[in-house]
Design a protein with these regions (language model features):
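Short, polar/acidic, helix-capping and beta-turn segments at strand->helix junctions
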Residues: 2-127
Length: 127
């Protein structure tokens, strides 16, 4: 039987609803979607996509580290964006946080995200 445990990092925003920052099983960590919130103020990091994607990646990294890994342990990202025109910017900034081989990734344009964020990313990390 797979036992699951909650992963909580104080260096990433606390959940803004009835869900965990992340759930770990014996071999994987499932990280809930992270929006660009400052972990201390729970305010949006800024209006620019560069600032927002950087904050999201920092939040994801904090959760990965708390779970015993890093962003390079991620095997799959799902990216939700409100403006597909920001695709190249997202690629450029994500590349700064990752090493090859890059994880698998899906990217979906959405109408809106919580707290008027322009980007949200969830992840699956291998332990």
């Amino acid at each position: 039987m797979n036992k699951k445990r909650s992963i909580v990092s104080n260096h990433a925003p606390q959940a803004i609803g009835p869900y965990s920052q992340a759930i770990a099983t014996s071999s994987r960590v499932y990280i809930s979607g992270q929006i660009p919130l400052n972990p201390e103020s729970l305010e949006l990091a800024g209006p620019d996509i560069d600032v927002q994607i950087t904050q999201v990646m920092k939040n994801l990294n904090a959760i990965c580290r708390k779970a015993g890994g890093s962003l390079n342990s991620v095997v799959k990202f799902t990216v939700f964006m409100t403006n597909i025109e920001d695709f190249n910017t997202v690629n450029r900034i994500m590349q700064n946080f990752l090493e090859e081989p890059y994880p698998a990734r899906s990217l979906v344009q959405v109408l809106a995200l919580p707290k008027q964020a322009d980007i949200e990313i969830d992840a699956i990390m291998e332990l």
